Amino acid sequence: MQFERTFSLVTKMRICVLGGAGHIGSGVVRALVKRAPDAEVVIADKNLEEAEELVAELGGKISTQSVDANDSKSLIKVMKDVDIAIGAIGPYYTYGVKVLKAAIDAKTNFVDIDDDYDATKACLALHEGAKKAGITAIIGLGATPGLTNILAKYGSEKLDKVDEIHTAWAWTAMDPFMGPAIIAHYFHASTGDVPTYRDGKWVEISALSEPEVVDFPPPLSGIEVYNVGHPEPVTIPRYIKGVKVVTNKGTVWPSLMTEASKIFAKLGLISLKEFTIKGVTMPVRDVAVQFVMSIPDLTPAETISALATEAEERYGEYALEGVGLKVKVKGESQRKTTCYSYGVACRSAVVCTALPAALGALMVAAGKVKEKGVFAPEGVIDSKSFLKEIAKDIEVLETEEKAGKL
């Protein structure tokens, strides 16, 4: 896909990145420094030591501020005096609504990378409150959801009629810097019944059901993915009218981690059901997350080495930090059945997630998005302008298939 790379962004602004010292949040800060070098960036995080290390590394107009995501007054305080805030504190089923409510109370424009379907529903329900506060809030603007949604919109705008939109992703589980929120999200998406959109209505289906091999761009290529709980089927039908089917399927690599997740889900070990161990009560999912975080210390070195070798042989330089995305938009154009496919293979899942959030925030702060309220990305972002900017750092491959006249 060839995009004209001419989109001017105003860079003299003040931006707060909540969770800006974290795995994804630090990527957002880096993207802002690269794309808007004159902007003032505030890293709001509970871990000020790591925040200061990031400031020392990047320099520029970056400052730090302590924030407690469980304290609404603390959240409001750091968001009060900025042009826009970016939420990178997860998991979003815990923090999505809390942080968005604080942004509304602070009357500050807002973008986040909310990737949990239930949090997405709850945040969209705050639309009128955000509208009354006079702010623009865009939720779920990462890689998936986010870039997937914008690609779905872009493809849909090229069709006369849209019938089906299929989104998929494959993510590394080998990144040594991956935080607990990402693991908790994957477990959340992989358990119980999750929403999808079929025959023009929302229905519940089993997570990790209906395996399908999706052909991502090389070197990722064919990877088996499964139904997961994600925002795309929740939001896309709200904005792309007439679509009858919207799906999201995903997985992680190496394959052993996918198989382990299936077993955990079947045994109920990644649910939010609470249990007590040695007098301490907690959701069983918290234990599973800590277990996964401890794999490097618990698993024999030869097993870790074998998994790394397997992934490197299969995915090459994408093995450790990569991600793959695929979007298919099916419908009708000039009375012909047409399918547009978009594929992304990115060496860095952090970049692929952080860059869309940074660009979206810059667009809102620069006045490129006028609507007030809470929206998913496809609801308010101009797909062509956005993808022109994405193309500077992330390659998107487009294919078109046409059948005979109807």
List each model region and its residues.
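N-terminal Rossmann NAD(P)H-binding glycine-rich loop of SDR-like oxidoreductase domains
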Residues: 16-31
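Conserved glycine-rich Rossmann-like NAD(P)H-binding loop of the short-chain dehydrogenase/reductase
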Residues: 37-47
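Helix N-cap at the beta1-alpha1 junction of Rossmann-like dinucleotide-binding domains, i.e.
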Residues: 47-49, 117
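Conserved Rossmann-fold cofactor-binding substructure of NAD(P)-dependent oxidoreductases
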Residues: 67-82, 88-91
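ADP-ribose/adenylate-binding Rossmann-like module
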Residues: 91, 102-120
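Rossmann-fold NAD(P)-binding glycine/threonine-rich loop
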Residues: 114-135
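C-terminal catalytic/substrate-binding lobe primarily of soluble NAD(P)-dependent oxidoreductases
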Residues: 158-406
